[in-house]
Each structure stands twice: as structure tokens, then as C-alpha cells.
């Protein structure tokens, strides 16, 4: 992604003398107290590096398909029905199940995605203290950044195959472990070992799902080196 602009950040609000060698941009919407043109109403800024992004569906947006529609992966901003994402995992999964007896109902899938998001929120808010992860997931008020639920939804079709012929409750636990593994591996600023990471080496099926989830998630990120 090319630079659209950069904000000067004061020390103590994300500005540093030395650049982070592995910075992943995380955008928040800029709030203005005066009426603005529509083009200025969708300006987001990364307070980690100062870059800003105009979220208007242009080529600078990273459009992804979620269970609720097309959003920009950089901001979580809903783009409406007229935009086409480059990757369409939800469309693909619907096409794959058209000729199958067991089809996924939209309400059922939506419920599963919300369950995963809620569990991830509580886990990373209460139990995870790994440097870099909390900052990437939560804003200054402790709420999930809007693009995180969108990314959870975006990669969820990778997990649907695990639910076939298995107890949903047990599979949700596995899926949560996979998400925790993927999120920590992407956002942690240091190498992490131990129980926090999903032990997938003995299960090639889970390992393949985790790899695909990570690839999809990483494909949406703006990385600064």
C-alpha cells in the first residue's frame, strides 16, 4: 500500500524517535467537531506510525468479504453492496456447499462468528499480556478495534470444515485455540512459546487450517519495516 499521508505524532501518543522494525498499522477514525465534506468524514489514522487512510473504497482500501458484507480490512468500515473484494472466502464456501446435504444457515454461521469474537475479546482482555498483541486488538478505551471482528469473520470459512460431523461445542474450543495461535503469531513483538500457542504439530488437519487462516489474515495487513 502506498503512503497516503503522515501525521506528526507527539511523544507519548505513538510517536517515537526510533521506528518499530515490525510495525503493523492499526487505524482509528479521526473525530472532528465541525461539519466536513463527505470525503473527509472517512479519514482514519494509525497512531503507531502517523499514516492516515481515507476509507472510501478506492484502491488504497483493502476490501474483504465478511459474513455481513464487504468491509475495509484496515478500518472495519462497511463499504456497501457495490464494492467487490479481491478475496471472497464466504462466496466460495457457499458455492462449495450448494450441492451438499448439510448447508450452513446464515444465522447459524453469524452466531458462531459472534461466539468466537466474544471469547477472543475476553481472553485477550483478561489473560493475555504479550507485548504488541493488546495494542493491536484494543483501542485506548479497551474496546476491540472495528477491523478485528471483520478479520475474524474474513478467515472463519477456513474453519467451517472442522464442524462437519463433530460437536459444535468441542470444535469451537479448537477454533478459538487456532485464532489465539494465529493472532499471537502475527501481532506478538517477541517469540512466544508454551501453552499460549496452539500445539498443532500432531494434527496436520488443524495445522493446515491455521496456516490458511494466517495467510488470509496477513494478506490484509499494512506492514511497515
From Swiss-Prot:
Part of the viral pre-initiation complex (vPIC) that is responsible for the expression of vPIC-dependent late genes. vPIC is composed of at least BcRF1 that binds the viral TATT box, BDLF3.5, BDLF4, BFRF2, BGLF3, BGLF4 and BVLF1. It comes from Epstein-Barr virus (strain B95-8) (HHV-4). Disulfide bonds: none annotated. Residues 1-20 are annotated as: Disordered. Belongs to the herpesviridae UL92 family. Keywords: Early protein. This is Late gene expression regulator BDLF4. Pfam families: Herpes_UL92.
Amino acid at each position: 500500500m502506498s503512503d497516503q499521508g503522515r501525521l506528526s505524532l507527539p511523544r507519548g501518543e505513538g510517536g517515537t524517535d526510533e521506528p518499530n522494525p515490525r510495525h503493523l498499522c492499526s487505524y482509528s477514525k479521526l473525530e472532528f467537531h465541525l461539519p466536513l465534506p463527505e470525503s473527509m468524514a472517512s479519514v482514519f489514522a494509525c497512531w503507531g506510525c502517523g499514516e492516515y487512510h481515507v476509507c472510501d473504497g478506492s484502491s488504497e482500501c483493502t476490501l474483504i468479504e465478511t459474513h455481513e458484507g464487504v468491509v475495509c480490512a484496515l478500518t472495519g468500515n462497511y463499504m456497501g453492496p457495490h464494492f467487490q473484494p479481491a478475496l471472497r472466502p464466504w462466496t466460495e464456501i457457499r458455492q462449495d456447499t450448494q450441492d451438499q446435504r448439510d448447508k450452513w444457515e446464515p444465522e447459524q454461521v453469524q452466531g458462531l462468528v459472534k461466539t468466537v469474537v466474544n471469547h477472543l475479546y475476553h481472553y485477550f482482555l483478561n489473560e493475555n499480556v504479550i507485548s504488541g498483541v493488546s495494542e493491536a486488538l484494543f483501542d485506548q478505551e479497551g474496546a476491540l478495534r472495528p477491523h478485528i471482528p471483520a478479520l475474524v469473520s474474513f478467515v472463519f470459512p477456513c474453519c467451517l470444515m472442522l464442524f462437519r460431523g463433530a460437536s459444535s461445542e468441542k470444535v469451537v474450543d479448537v477454533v478459538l485455540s487456532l485464532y489465539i495461535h494465529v493472532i499471537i503469531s502475527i501481532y506478538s513483538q517477541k517469540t512466544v512459546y508454551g501453552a499460549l500457542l496452539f500445539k498443532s504439530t500432531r494434527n496436520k488437519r488443524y495445522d493446515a487450517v491455521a496456516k490458511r487462516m494466517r495467510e488470509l489474515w496477513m494478506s490484509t495487513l499494512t506492514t511497515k519495516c
